[in-house]
Amino acid sequence: MSIAAKDIEPADIPGNLQGGEYSPYHVFSAEEWSRFRADTPLTLTADEVQRLRSLNDPVDLDEVRRIYLSLSRLLSAHVEASQILFRQRTRFLSMSNETKTPFVIGVAGSVAVGKSTTARILAELLARWPSSPKVDLVTTDGFLYPNAVLQRENLMDRKGFPASYDIGALLRFLSAIKAGRPNVKAPTYSHLTYDVIPDQFQVIDRPDILIFEGINVLQSRDLPADGKIVPMVSDFFDFSIYIDAEESLIHSWYVNRFMRLRETAFQSPQSFFHRYATISEDAARAIAEGLWHNINLKNLHQNILPTRPRADLILQKGPNHLTQTVALRKL
């Protein structure tokens, strides 16, 4: 079932992705999308959802029931289809000892839009399928260059931009995952110290499903003049999700989150942002506004938002972080 563009207010639909004959997407209201969950069981509790959601993100059990159960069912269909294709291909190649590589799901979107909450909820729901798949979640934060490198290269004010990531390490990690290698190491990151943690890794050992979450995971790269092969992060994805919202909403969520962190995590003397915990509320808000306009808004316009049309599925959020529309790429 597809929804005609006239059935939904244009403001509720991401950019120019309105549903219709010439759109690459089917677009559904949240209510219509919720019907696709069919008999998918709700395997999370309200307390678990509260534990999984990020600071200042009010996603609750009703939102899981309304949006995430249908998404879980859709992803189950995609994983099953990939397994069928794998068996057919191994028969074709007479490779009976071949082991299927992980199904990789990319989750992209702006800072403060709710990527981490989406990724964590999906990881829990998928791990509780009847088949009990092994599900791992990795974020791109660990692939940022250490602060010492960013400071040396004058990139601290562009942290989160493509140049601030060790793309080579990131691509080597995904290549190893898709090659089916065991015990692949992913670097880890501390949001308290705002830096990569030296010599600390998350070990990923041949999961059935890997969720890979980060702001720029759908970004393309310029082709080199010498004609060398340049893989992109999204080349390793079997399915991709973009979390979207109006710019004004993301702006307010970012500032509100900063002010909440000022009262919580920033209070720790170990926090990179501890200096903001003791200044006035007006001064802190002014700093948050500056960080938004000078760094995060520019990154959104230049590097994140242009990748939205590359996603297989777009969750468009409205006020209170609740999903209003879902756009699913046509096959």
Curated annotation (Swiss-Prot):
Binding site for ATP: 109-116
Presence of the UniProt keyword Nucleotide-binding in the record: yes
Top enzyme category: transferase
Record localization: Cytoplasm
Catalytic activity: (R)-pantothenate + ATP = (R)-4'-phosphopantothenate + ADP + H(+)
Entry annotated with the keyword Aminoacyl-tRNA synthetase: no
Lineage: Bacteria, Pseudomonadati, Pseudomonadota, Alphaproteobacteria, Hyphomicrobiales
Protein name: Pantothenate kinase
